[in-house]
Amino acid sequence: MLILSRKEEESIVIGDEIVIKVVSIDKGSVKLGFEAPPHMLILREELKKAVADENLKASAQSDEIALTSLSQKLKK
């Protein structure tokens, strides 16, 4: 992991398309601004984990429904 120090209003550039700017620093919180192409998805880590968890739950429910349906068809 690369660790960099930046002050307020300073930026970090990733490749040719991404700029991360320190917008403000206040009471243990850092506000960041991101400039990136529209096709790039930018998510907070906890939101990405929540989406992945919901996808797993939905997949498990879908598998259960499919198995129940298949079981009923086999009984006929």
From Swiss-Prot:
Superkingdom in the source lineage: Bacteria
Gene Ontology CC entries for this record: cytosol
A GO molecular function held by the record: mRNA 5'-UTR binding
GO biological process entries: bacterial-type flagellum organization; mRNA catabolic process; negative regulation of translational initiation; regulation of bacterial-type flagellum assembly; regulation of carbohydrate metabolic process
SUPFAM superfamilies assigned to the protein according to its UniProt record, in alphabetical order: CsrA-like
Record bears the keyword Cytoplasm: yes
Entry annotated with the keyword Cell inner membrane: no
Pfam family, one: CsrA
Swiss-Prot/TrEMBL keywords: Bacterial flagellum biogenesis, Cytoplasm, Repressor, RNA-binding, Translation regulation
Signal sequence region: none
Subcellular localization: Cytoplasm
Gene3D superfamilies: Translational regulator CsrA
Function as written in the Swiss-Prot or TrEMBL entry: A translational regulator that binds mRNA to regulate translation initiation and/or mRNA stability. Usually binds in the 5'-UTR at or near the Shine-Dalgarno sequence preventing ribosome-binding, thus repressing translation. Its main target seems to be the major flagellin gene, while its function is anatagonized by FliW.
UniProt record similarity statement: Belongs to the CsrA/RsmA family.
Subunit structure: Homodimer; the beta-strands of each monomer intercalate to form a hydrophobic core, while the alpha-helices form wings that extend away from the core.
Protein name: Translational regulator CsrA
Taxonomic classification: Bacteria, Pseudomonadati, Campylobacterota, Epsilonproteobacteria, Campylobacterales
Gene: csrA
